């Protein structure tokens, strides 16, 4: 029986900071589970394992993840394996969303499983609320209710402020990653060094890294089209010098070939790279 994945989009008061809350579960325990390749998408996530913990390949060994942690924004893929009994909840934040909601800087958190105690006491409280819920659906509702109450208690207008990097992020998405850092700084009205510090603080990535990830997102969306285009045409349209340039960048970010199929990334990973989600990411919705 396949994993059951459920996604609940963030309501309007949270939408500036949070994309969604999600759950993945399985009604029957399974011993032999395939690996998943989780690709960079620019979004850090709160992960709470209510059942057995996922494992992640680290230095060629499978290491069990903490029961609750922040999955720092990825600049390279994570290879993970579901446990026998799956019951996991995620809160997927937008770029800059954690800093906007909780004031926690993300500098130095990229590609890490970050202890919640290193970030923000409210994140610990949110994880506890998720753990206490009776089932996946209750956990998603409880997480959303807690986040709405947190915003109402800390913001007079009941809405999350836009992240400081929001203008630059929108410019990158609007161009689908076809923009240089100097042009991005000009679009954001910031000196380059200040923009780089802001990006590190709010996304854990440099502007250049984030640009590459958005360009990857655009590529994944095009490569998954029913009628596949010639790779050279895709490469040139995406702003690469040639197909070889695209292939090198794609391999560096995904550790797989551009010609591989999305379904090969794993039964959890395919939900994160659905065409509709990639399109929403590119549009900033």
Sequence positions of predicted segments:
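Alpha-helical bundle regulatory/interaction domains
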Residues: 1-192, 202-207, 221-241, 257-285
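DNA major-groove recognition helix of helix-turn-helix
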Residues: 199, 211, 250, 262
């Amino acid at each position: 029986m396949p994993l059951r994945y459920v996604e609940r989009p963030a309501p309007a008061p949270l939408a500036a900071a949070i994309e969604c809350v999600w759950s993945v579960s399985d009604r029957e325990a399974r011993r032999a589970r395939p690996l998943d390749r989780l690709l960079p998408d620019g979004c850090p996530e709160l992960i709470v394992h209510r059942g057995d913990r996922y494992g992640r390949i680290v230095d060629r060994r499978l290491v069990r993840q903490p029961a609750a942690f922040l999955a720092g924004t990825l600049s390279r893929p994570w290879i993970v394996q579901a446990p026998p009994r799956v019951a996991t909840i995620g809160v997927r934040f937008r770029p800059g969303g954690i800093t906007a909601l909780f004031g926690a800087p993300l500098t130095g958190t990229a590609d890490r499983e970050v202890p919640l105690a290193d970030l923000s006491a409210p994140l610990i409280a949110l994880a506890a609320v998720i753990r206490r819920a009776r089932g996946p659906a209750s956990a998603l509702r409880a997480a959303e209710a807690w986040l709405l109450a947190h915003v109402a208690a800390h913001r007079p207008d009941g809405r999350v402020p836009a992240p400081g990097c929001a203008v630059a992020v929108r410019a990158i998405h609007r161009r689908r990653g076809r923009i240089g850092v100097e042009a991005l700084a000009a679009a954001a009205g910031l000196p380059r060094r200040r923009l780089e510090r802001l990006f590190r603080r709010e996304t854990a990535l440099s502007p250049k890294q984030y640009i590459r990830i958005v360009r990857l997102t655009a590529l994944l969306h095009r490569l998954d089209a029913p009628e596949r285009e010639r790779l050279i045409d895709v490469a040139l349209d995406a702003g690469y010098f040639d197909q070889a340039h695209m292939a090198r960048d794609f391999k560096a970010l995904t550790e797989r070939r551009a010609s591989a199929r999305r379904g090969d990334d794993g039964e959890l990973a395919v939900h994160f790279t659905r065409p509709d989600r990639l399109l929403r990411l590119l549009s900033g919705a």
